[in-house]
């Protein structure tokens, strides 16, 4: 039985078979035939589909090649670069985010009550105590002597056990310790200023006391001192009368302040809470010689409102 879709000869794979009512016969391949095998369809729509498929296949292949070339031309995104959506973020701090060194704090203005340290060098032949006293007056600041070192000669010390309370020592002595204070004003108490020194003699004896006369430096004398300003003079112990007067003054001041505050708050409250006179009575009206209290008037609640006028 013949296939109604095929008309004429059908050449498939180089085998030619005529369309007959019987089965097609087989023949040997003709190697000299250069024409490509063809198929003939009786339906024109199938011919159109076959032609369209054959003509569209090269275009599809060309389009796929162009897409592959465009993918190859695109640069690869490095991991961690941050330019791609799938790129990993770099770990750690970004560059330049570390703590930068801060500039040092410079104090441009010093407090007048602050202490200033000094290293003073007293020349040979100068009086140590007089030099320190002159330095305090010239600078206008008090001088607190912390320590000293050097050699001195012809020392006059104050000692209560000696006759007259003063001892004059001749020779050269080494300073072991020295402390004291000098105030810039001449009217300061004598006990508040002065110099106390301990000396070692050539034979190992140690003497000390308050300097009561010249203290001549026989070599360079180094003094470590601190200067101060705005020193307050206090007399101790504080007397009992002063201790009692101060609390009384504080209590009186507190009471007076509280009274003033109460008066101010009362005035403000009265101004804010003033009510219109009740029962057409003047505000200064005093019934039965006594002023009517507010709670006597309002104990029954506020009066009813007048009906609106139509």
UniProtKB/Swiss-Prot annotation:
GO cellular component: nucleus
A Gene Ontology molecular function term of the record: minor groove of adenine-thymine-rich DNA binding
DNA-binding positions: 88-100
Low complexity: bias regions: 94-104
Ranges annotated as biased composition (Polar residues): 31-41, 51-67
UniProt xrefs under SUPFAM superfamilies: AF0104/ALDC/Ptd012-like (SSF117856)
The protein, known as: AT-hook motif nuclear-localized protein 15
Organism: Arabidopsis thaliana (Mouse-ear cress)
Entry note about domains: The PPC domain mediates interactions between AHL proteins.
Highest taxon above the source species: Eukaryota
Entry-linked Pfam families: PCC
CDD domains in the cross-refs: DUF296
Every PPC domain range: 112-251
Further facts: Overexpression of AHL15 results in a decreased flg22-induced expression of FRK1.
Segments for region (Disordered): 15-112, 239-310
Biased composition annotated in UniProt, kind: Pro residues: 301-310
Functional note: Transcription factor that specifically binds AT-rich DNA sequences related to the nuclear matrix attachment regions (MARs). Binds the DNA sequence GNFEI (GA-negative feedback element I) in the GA3OX1 promoter. Negatively regulates plant innate immunity (PTI) to pathogens through the down-regulation of the PAMP-triggered FRK1 expression.
Any one Gene Ontology BP term: negative regulation of innate immune response
